[in-house]
């Protein structure tokens, strides 16, 4: 989670509210509030915490205002029961009473019925004002769908300039999944798992793993760039399984795939697709794939897939778990990426990651056609990881990254990050040793930012041990040799 993501989600929520799409705005506002709550746990400065709490309250107030608008609109819809369709084209005149309109608005006030031809100049002026005002002011539509182009005669008689503006608005609108027939709460729960339209993680942000990057580009990225080539027998792969020890960068690779493909990115885990109510877990799986097809091209990243799709037929397996696995297998086989008559640019790619590939069901292993190994970083990769982690720190002249990389052989990417974090705190620990809390608060900022020395890294390497054993590496290599598909 980053401040950039929070900022973009706030902009998206406000844009939805301005366009009258209040239900989508509420979903975005709720997501932002949860993101800020999580971010508050990482903030240590009390002054920053107070500022973020104030931001949370302001955004929560905006959310409450949008909810109040929705309740007002719903009350109007319940109270208005016309016996026949309104005489005008859009029926706008019969929705809002005269006293509601206190200022200039894209909606006309209630007037006595007059023939349409007599009010032609007036309606044209109002339609132009409506198109402009709904981008600058908070709209007050009856059903939250004010951004649609005008209908009927008004659409034909509008000025060409207004038609161009409306076309631009419709292109910028974000399409929304119509979950008719499904529980609204289930759809909103899955919408919160859409990380971003663009996770903004590039290949260069990931150290080493050149072979894995090459395979993922061929399996996922190239079909988006060369749709005419990847047809027939060359159709894109249905799914990719990334296998490897913990902390080797499998999640980062998934985000890089979504960024390079410009796809919608679903981050799914076992908690997303499980429910205490009978039958809802299977519905969640089906809704997930229907939403993925709607927002295609889409990348569905299922982390720790072994927790959902372990082997079937074992004594520990529950009936509910078996039904979820069956639905997931059916939906994955139905996605199919792109066949002879389908557009590869509208594919749905299932990207999975696991630390226990030997526990995965055989049918799922067959559907994940590409199975690649994400190993521990090499010596060159460890040096690159050190440079990425230490780019914001001031280092002493005696720091030798090549030597640190040599001493950290067998460490995963997460282990190397922990070593760098621990070493960066060494100077601060030495500075505050033996001081009282009052003296610590009075230390200047310049004194706290001391250079990190080679001795700090050597001490951290002694304190931080490897998280992956040699026996585990042998198991991964044996499995990938038997079932790998690189």
Curated annotation (Swiss-Prot):
Task: State the InterPro entries in the record.
Answer: AAA+_ATPase, AAA_lid_3, ATPase_AAA_core, ATPase_AAA_CS, KATNA1, KATNA1_MIT, KTNA1_AAA_dom, MT-severing_AAA_ATPase
Pfam families hit by this protein: AAA (PF00004), AAA_lid_3 (PF17862), KATNA1_MIT (PF21126), Vps4_C (PF09336)
Q: Name one GO cellular component term.
A: cytoplasm
Cite a single GO BP annotation: microtubule severing
**Gene3D superfamilies the UniProt entry points to:** 1.10.8.60, P-loop containing nucleotide triphosphate hydrolases (3.40.50.300), Phosphotransferase system, lactose/cellobiose-type IIA subunit (1.20.58.80)
Q: Which reaction does it catalyse?
A: n ATP + n H2O + a microtubule = n ADP + n phosphate + (n+1) alpha/beta tubulin heterodimers
Q: How is its activity regulated?
A: ATPase activity is stimulated by microtubules, which promote homooligomerization. ATP-dependent microtubule severing is stimulated by interaction with katnb1.
Give the span(s) annotated as Disordered.
103-174
Record's keyword annotation contains Transcription: no
Among PROSITE patterns, the record links this protein to: AAA
- Keyword RNA-binding part of the UniProt annotation: no
Q: Where does ATP bind?
A: 244-251
PANTHER family in the cross-refs: AAA DOMAIN-CONTAINING (PTHR23074), KATANIN P60 ATPASE-CONTAINING SUBUNIT A1 (PTHR23074:SF71)
Query: Member of which family?
Result: Belongs to the AAA ATPase family. Katanin p60 subunit A1 subfamily.
Designated name of the protein: Katanin p60 ATPase-containing subunit A1
What species is given as this protein's source?
A: Salmo salar (Atlantic salmon)
The encoding gene is katna1
